[in-house]
Amino acid sequence: MKLPKGTRSSVYFAQHPEKEPLPSRQEVKQTPVIMAKIKGPGPAKYLRPSCTGYIDHDISMFKAPAYTLHSRHSEKRMVCHSSPGPCYLLDPKITRFGMSSCPQVPMEERISNLRLNPTLASCQYYFEKIHPPGERRAPQYTFGYRRPYRVMDLNPAPNQYQMPLLLGPNTPVSRAAPCYSLASRDKNWFYKEDVAGGPGPTTYARPEPSIYQNRSPTYSMAKRFAYPLDLTPRPGPGSHEVQQVTVHKPHIPAFTMGIKHSLHLCPLVIDIRD
């Protein structure tokens, strides 16, 4: 279908624009498919459901009956239980229709006859055990067991006290003769022996003469002040590397040889978080 001359650039809704012809098979550049460029979860992301146990079991697999084995309950577990337990005992005789029980008769002991006289008979008296009231008899005594000492009685016994000695000068109740002490001869009375028992004249330090005499003037000698210097750290002649200066001098081209890195290198994954 030919279009008018003035409307070659316009497109009608009733027709489709002409498609450009595709290049031949020789002109299409074949590039290998790199799986690392495909952004999506890998095959290990989707796991199959487990075939063991009863939680999240695979529905396509047969599942055997599962039983739970619990440990034996101890007395401590029953004691630590916070529920009130069977303290609310309901009477089994009470039903929703009321009391339901058979006739009951209480059985008690036989009551003694209150009309009988409790006076003792003549056969219940023992005359052989009674001494004649008009005759003399020897005194009778009762021997009981010895009372034990009190455990909390902490008083010392008589053998815990010692009598004072009667020998020597330390007698508080008797008169003692004079007592002398004899020392050994291995003690030499030299000039170094402290007989008086007090400090010597060399023990005390001699005071300064300025304390008890007229004090002369004193002066303090200080060090000489240094000239002000600029201590700012500055580089010396050996700090500059002249061989590396290439700003104003010609130099040969330099290349950096490194390692070829791949954009699709698998990184080291240490912590896996689902």
UniProtKB/Swiss-Prot annotation:
UniProt GO cellular component terms: cytoskeleton
Keyword Cell cycle: no
InterPro entries, alphabetized: CIMAP, SHIPPO-rpt
STPGR repeat start-end pairs: 199-224, 235-260
Ranges of biased composition (kind: Basic and acidic residues): 16-27
Keywords assigned by UniProt, alphabetized: Repeat
Domain of life: Eukaryota
UniProt region (Disordered), positions on chain: 1-27
Pfam family, one: SHIPPO-rpt
Family: Belongs to the CIMAP family.
UniProt name for this protein: Protein CIMAP1C
Gene: CIMAP1C
